[in-house]
A protein has these predicted regions:
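A general secondary-structure signal for short beta-strands and their flanking turns/coil
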Residues: 2, 15, 44, 429, ...
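A short, contiguous, amphipathic alpha-helix enriched in charged residues
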Residues: 2, 6, 31-32, 658-671
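Inter-lobe coupling/hinge segments of SF2-like helicase ATPases
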Residues: 200-206, 210, 224-660, 672, ...
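A general secondary-structure junction signal
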Residues: 53-55, 105, 185-187, 436-438, ...
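Solvent-exposed, membrane-proximal periplasmic/extracellular interface segments of envelope transport
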Residues: 55, 59-72, 687, 692-705
Length: 741
């Protein structure tokens, strides 16, 4: 027999099937998806690869076919359906097959099982008493102590015996040899969630919730599988609807995957699912230990778990009978991978569901333009929930023009209106959230005389000032001491653009010394359980004000929060990205949804320098329809997704001149082969950051009405790049409908 193998080398020229002979000793245990050790190249270097299929026939000269050395015993095998999914992802998004295979295999190495030992008493009550008397007579205190404990509790934890009873291993062995007890071992799964109590709490659903639940249940039980878009305002009870949908699927003996956009959402989301489904729920994220991740994947593979919750990578959970994929907050950009293959979880979920006879539910208060566009075309079933589940009123929104604040002499980042409302909420013993889409103690350093901005020498991005007198590059990690005079003109009038979460925290503490303030951003959430600790502390009312980046306004439910302040609402509005209006609208609308979720009315303050922008106006009015209509006209006029499709050809090289020349040839090739295809080629151009770690970057954008047209173009470009030696020093990647330009 022979095996088709993809070698574990990420090079385009080796991205093909290599056939190997299977030795007799491995024929019974080798299966597709296993990692194997193989001789490769002229020197027969031992490398690893993945078996994609087995065959009885050889496609090459038999005398030249090499033999597999062994199976990689410590690796996790990829299931056949995930191999097929990887092949589809390679075709759709580019990259190599080995990159795609590693993407669909979140856990690559086996981990040693965690074993728990017990001591079990083997004697009858009468025999035990006789033995105890014997040990006491012989003054064998440790043996007597252990046997006495076993008489009271016939099964004892091994660790308790050795630590609490102070009994050594030789004593335990002696009693085992005498037939008094037996040492038993069992495998224990590492559960990353400490609380797992199931509670039957009756939920009274609104008419809107019932309509969605019944519609889904009717479809599912009739065998209809489709993709649903659930557009529900913040607080409308989308999570309760998800759980009822999952219950329908689980009752049919199937499993469900629930994707979340950020690790910060895991704690609250998982607790709600645990209360509903108990320990049949599991969690997967990057902060778990290798052992925890391995245990949860193996439980899912064996069908011991009904629901897997996690970020994008949880999409590849190897459930035996997948019935439903839920993508909560589907508009979030974190669902798009920035690593090759640059897939979008929404598209891969829809494809996996089609293959495995499952349904997909996309949920959001601010659906992505792509999802709503497809729903309007009839590709997705649209459900809408326009009211909050407990009939709370939507928050009152105030838009503050910061230009007027400056004219009135207020140079603080907190407007007079916001300061007034914060004081009011503190007096009322209510909670406040203040968010800023910035990281670090402050922003960039600029000279007020010549305008020079201090940048990273390796990345062409501004350095940010952090506490401790350091200036840091957030792209490559470069650090240098804080400058005291301008390196360009020598002026001492150089300083920070003050807009960082640490800076806001300090200002709030100074302005409201009586307030207890917590901060949540990338710097305060680096440790494993830091998200959980900060969110729990705020939920338990251990703080009055939570200051943070955009992660604090996404999906969290704090009933005591009655005021939300968006401190720099338009900071993301004029980035070099066609999605900037959409992102600003989504962020502000999500922020507005955090206020007034309990029985108290909520208020939101949006601080902006451009109150007339349609994204600001629509978010203040919480009017998705108004925003969508204006935004889709803009996308249609400019030929941007979702109306048309966009492919970014990303090229990188250490030699800037060679990079410019190669990109020119690439563009000429595209224009030469496009024929009658409707293509619009833009560039080559410099991306927002044109150099990272001394590697220069350029990008060519190609627009086309049909996605398939771009896939075919990508395939031909890959062939062109492979046969032309001029591209050997280049790294070229493809990104379809990129989230960032």
């Amino acid at each position: 027999m022979f095996a088709d193998v993809i070698v574990d080398i990420q090079h385009e020229k080796l991205d093909k099937i290599f056939q190997y002979r299977i030795p007799e000793r491995l024929k019974d245990e080798l299966h597709p998806g296993m990692e194997v050790i193989i001789p490769f190249g002229k020197g027969n270097r031992q490398i690893k690869g993945y078996v994609t299929s087995l065959s009885e026939t050889c496609n090459y000269d038999l005398s030249k076919v090499k033999e597999i050395t062994d199976i990689s015993r410590n690796s996790v095998a990829i299931e056949a359906r995930l191999i097929a999914l990887a092949a589809w992802m390679k075709e759709q998004y580019g990259g190599t097959m080995i990159q795609a295979l590693k993407t669909v295999l979140p856990i690559k190495q086996k981990e040693n099982a965690k074993v728990k030992k017990h001591l079990r008493l083997l004697l009858t009550e009468e025999e035990s008493q006789e033995k105890l008397a014997f040990y006491q007579k012989k003054n064998q205190k440790a043996r007597a102590r252990l046997l006495k404990a076993l008489i009271e509790a016939p099964i004892l934890d091994y660790e308790l015996v050795t630590k609490k009873l102070n009994v050594t291993l030789p004593v335990i062995r002696a009693l085992e040899e005498q037939g008094v007890l037996k040492i038993e071992s069992e495998q224990v799964y590492r559960n990353p969630v400490k609380q797992a109590k199931k509670s039957q709490q009756e939920i009274i659903y609104t008419e809107e919730q019932q309509h969605v639940i019944q519609g889904f249940r009717q479809d599912y039980l009739c065998g209809t599988r489709r993709t649903y878009l659930l557009h529900g305002v913040t607080g409308s009870g989308k999570t309760e609807v998800y759980m009822e949908m999952i219950r329908t699927v689980v009752d049919q003996g199937k499993q469900a995957i629930v994707l979340i956009p950020e690790i910060a959402l895991t704690y609250q989301t998982v607790m709600r699912f645990y209360r509903c489904f108990g320990d049949r729920v599991s969690i997967m994220n990057s902060r778990l230990s290798a052992g925890e991740r391995y245990d949860q994947m193996m439980r899912a593979k064996r069908g011991e778990v009904d629901v897997m919750i996690g970020p994008r990578s949880a999409l590849f959970t190897p459930f035996p009978d997948l019935g439903l994929i839920v993508i909560d907050e589907e508009h979030e950009p974190t669902y798009k991978s920035e690593q090759v293959p640059r897939y979008h979880a929404r598209e891969v979920a829809v494809h996996r569901a089609e293959v495995e006879d499952a349904s997909v539910v996309l949920g959001s208060a601010t659906p992505s333009m792509e999802a709503m566009y497809r729903a309007r075309l009839g590709e997705y079933q649209l459900y809408e929930m326009k009211n909050r589940s407990h009939m709370q009123q939507m928050a009152t929104v105030y838009t503050v023009d910061m230009r007027k604040e400056l004219k009135n002499g207020n140079r603080s980042i907190l407007s007079e209106k916001l300061q007034e409302l914060i004081e009011d909420r503190l007096n009322a013993k209510e909670q406040i959230m203040l968010f800023l889409n910035r990281r670090g103690y402050s922003g960039f350093v600029s000279c007020r005389e010549c305008g020079h901005v201090v940048k990273c020498p390796h990345c062409n991005v501004s350095l940010s000032v952090h506490k401790g007198g350091k200036m840091v590059c957030h792209y490559c990690g470069y650090e240098q001491p804080k400058v005291t005079e301008c390196p360009e003109c020598g002026s001492r009038y150089i300083g920070e653009f003050r807009a960082g979460t640490q800076q806001i925290e300090d200002m709030v503490k100074a302005r409201f010394p009586q307030a207890r303030v917590l901060r949540m951003d990338m710097d305060t959430t680096k440790k494993k359980d830091s998200h959980e600790q900060i969110l729990s502390a705020f939920a338990n009312e251990e703080a009055d004000i939570l200051v943070g980046t955009q992660m604090i306004v996404k999906g969290h439910d704090f009933p005591k929060v009655t005021l939300v302040g968006a401190l720099a609402a338009d900071m993301s509005l004029y980035t070099d990205d066609y999605r900037s209006g959409e992102r600003t609208f989504q962020l502000l609308t999500q922020a507005a949804g955090r206020a007034g979720r309990g029985d108290r009315p909520g208020e939101v303050v949006i601080q902006t320098y451009d109150p007339e922008h349609y994204a600001i106006e629509a978010s203040a009015a919480q009017d998705y329809e108004a925003f969508y209509e204006k935004e889709i006209r803009y996308r249609s006029l400019m030929g941007y997704p979702p109306v048309e499709n966009l492919m970014a050809v990303l090229a990188a090289c250490e030699d800037e001149a060679l990079l410019e020349k190669a990109c020119k040839y690439l563009k000429e090739y595209i224009l030469r082969i496009k024929g009658q295809a409707q293509l619009n080629v833009i560039g080559p151009a410099s991306p927002g950051v044109d150099k990272i770690k001394d590697i220069y970057r350029r990008v060519i954008y190609v627009k086309a009405p049909e996605y398939r047209t771009l896939v075919v173009l990508k395939d031909r470009m890959e062939q062109y790049i492979e046969i032309n030696s001029g591209f050997q020093k280049m790294r070229i990647q493809f990104d379809f409908n990129p989230m960032n330009l």
